[in-house]
């Protein structure tokens, strides 16, 4: 699904169909715990093995907690429901999207729509004034 192979390293796809934040790239984790067992089911009913859970992003500023590492997953996926469960509002517009903290009414990050897919580039979030980006804790 990467549209430009040179810039897809930290592209994250936002969608309401994902139940959890997930990636297949172990090198993105700044903190990681191995997990035994567990699978995720994709839209085509294929299953992916959960290898572990952890934190991805910048160590001191922008990060996402409770991201699953799924064996063989080719894309980085952000769950809209997980974002909302953490007290955020996700707003989709024709060419962009915004995630805002509802209590502080502060934009956490801005994404863009390219070829009908909303994405954010985690590596550029610090340029948008992002301080912290977290997800809910799951029992895995």
Predicted regions span which residues?
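Residue-level marker of conserved, structurally anchoring positions within well-ordered domains
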Residues: 1-140
């Amino acid at each position: 699904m990467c549209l430009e192979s040179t810039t897809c390293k930290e592209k994250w796809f936002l969608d309401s169909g994902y139940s959890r934040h997930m990636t297949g790239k172990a090198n993105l984790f700044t903190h990681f715990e191995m997990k035994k067992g567990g699978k995720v089911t994709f839209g085509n009913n294929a299953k992916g093995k959960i290898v572990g859970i952890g934190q991805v992003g910048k160590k001191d500023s922008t990060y996402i907690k409770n991201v699953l590492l799924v064996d063989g997953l080719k894309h980085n996926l952000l769950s809209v429901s997980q974002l909302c469960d953490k007290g955020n509002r996700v707003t989709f517009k024709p060419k962009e999207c915004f995630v805002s903290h509802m209590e502080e009414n502060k934009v956490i990050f801005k994404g863009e729509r390219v070829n009908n897919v909303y994405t954010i580039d985690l590596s550029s979030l610090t340029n948008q004034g992002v301080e912290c980006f977290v997800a809910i804790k799951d029992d895995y």
